[in-house]
Each structure stands twice: as C-alpha cells, then as structure tokens.
Amino acid sequence: TGYASFPQNGAGGGEAGGPGGNPAMNSRPTDNNYGAFGGEGVFSTITGTPIGYAGGGSGGSHAPHYPSSGTAHNGDPRAGHQINIGKRYGGADGGIGNSQPASSGSDAPANLGGGGGGSGQYNVHCGGGGSGVVILRMPTAMYTGTTTGSPTVTTDGPDTILKFTGSGTYVS
C-alpha cells in the first residue's frame, strides 16, 4: 500500500529551555503509541507573576490501521502518559492521525511564544506557533511614559512594567 504498518509518531519541538522528547514507539502497532512532548520553555517572573514562555509543541501521532492505539502526547496522566512539558510554557498539543477525522495539531496560545503542535496525518495541518511578547521592567522613577503602540502598563511595587503584544516602542 505504500504506507508503514507500524505507528509513525513525531518528536516534540525543542524550545528555549531544552530539546523536545523522542516519540514512544512500541514494537506492536496495537500498543499505545504517542507523539513526544514539547521542549521545556522558561519561567519568568518579570511581570510579578511566574509565567511560562517559549515551550515546544507536542509531536503528532499516527498509528495506521489501529484506530484506538495512536494518541497525541497531550499530558493525560490517567492514560499513563507523561505531561506535555512544553504545554506548561505555552506549547501546543499534537494531533492524532488515526482519529475520525484526523486531527490537526493545536495552535499555541497567543503572546507566550510557544510552538504549535504537530499534525497527526498528511492531510491535516500543524498548529501555529504562538505570537511573542516584549516585556520591559524598570524603576518607576525612571519611567518616561513615552511609548508608541498600545503596551499594557502596570506597576509592581517600585517598578513599572510595559508589556507589548504588538508593535510599539518605548523611549527612555
């Protein structure tokens, strides 16, 4: 048929904090197989709250001819899977190729810089990567207030924080 009879599972995407994982490939196509977790991103507290950024997207999974065996590596510990590490940092889940219909990879959330999830099959799409963000933190006494664009401006103790999710500038 031209198709492999054993599962084809994608590796997870690497990101800021490390590489993605390797896919699980069992010796029999009826075993549980899944795409690998996305790479670990980085946690930052620049906004005053710990937030994960730049996580890798999970790899997609496709186990042909065995509809119940392929699963995306989306972090369901009840199913015996490891957590998709990249998801904690804005990475997205991978798709499942042998579901009906086959599923695309998930899009990563906006403004966290994470990777999109891998697709589960040739005829569906990978998820889109998340948009980035620029965050500036400075002592309020040094903040000039001169900006372009529409940054979110907040304070945390003695500091002012500017968060740009689109284009803009700050002049110090």
Predicted regions and their residues:
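Low-complexity, glycine/proline-biased repetitive segments and flexible coils/loops
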Residues: 1-172
